[in-house]
Amino acid sequence: MATVSMRDMLQAGVHFGHQTRYWNPKMKPFIFGARNKVHIINLEKTVPMFNEALAELSKISSRKGKILFVGTKRAASEAVKEHALSCDQFFVNHRWLGGMLTNWKTVRQSIKRLKDLEIQSQDGTFDKLTKKEALMRTRELSKLENSLGGIKDMGGLPDALFVVDADHEHIAIKEANNLGIPVFSIVDTNSDPDGVDFIIPGNDDAIRAVSLYLTAVAATVREGRSQDLAQQAEETFAEAE
């Protein structure tokens, strides 16, 4: 299982929180102090909490669990997509649509529409339409791909959420809470940790910090999935004997 050290976190700037005036008092247990009116996160808390989260994510992925990566703000968007794809998982990296989890039935219909449009764009259907109609469908396809492309093959609700910014993604967290889906989240000093099952106190703005979290999570998920595949191979071999 991938692990992250104190040194890795220091180099990535994980310990830098927000300005002290923007703090959420619920994050007090995870704050070491302040420097130049900026809160410093206690990495002695973060390191074991992150590694505990990784261990749990490894268990989920080794049971074929589906993990949804959520990070819709600019600093995280591309990295969220890249790392989710690198471990064959799912992502939302633009806008979180209200009801994405709690109204899955409707979302599933939109995903079906997205897949239908993808087929039409490839089988020549668009070429037979008027320019105006083809343009409208192309725009619809682009819009649906933007919002649902990362979950179109999820095939049902996820088994866990990995969230980059608890404050920014509070709607996603609330929906997961309502459905009993465990939430793993980076929680900065300005955020509310309530509703997060596995809190990872840390900087959620610095690109290097965000990349550090995502790299470790993706590696852990890949490893967990390979354990599952190895176990399947062993069982198949045993049956053959």
Curated annotation (Swiss-Prot):
Cited Gene3D superfamilies: Glucose-6-phosphate isomerase like protein, domain 1, Helix hairpin bin
Q: Which GO terms describe its molecular function?
A: structural constituent of ribosome
Keyword field contains Ribonucleoprotein: yes
Instruction: Return the InterPro entries for the record.
Output: Ribosomal_uS2, Ribosomal_uS2_bac/mit/plastid, Ribosomal_uS2_CS, Ribosomal_uS2_flav_dom_sf
Indicate yes or no for the key word Ribonucleoprotein.
yes
Disulfide partners: none
Mind telling me which GO cellular component terms the entry cites? cytosolic small ribosomal subunit
Question: Which SUPFAM superfamilies does its entry note?
Answer: Ribosomal protein S2
Q: Which family does it belong to?
A: Belongs to the universal ribosomal protein uS2 family.
Annotated protein name in UniProt: Small ribosomal subunit protein uS2
Q: Which organism is it from?
A: Erwinia tasmaniensis (strain DSM 17950 / CFBP 7177 / CIP 109463 / NCPPB 4357 / Et1/99)
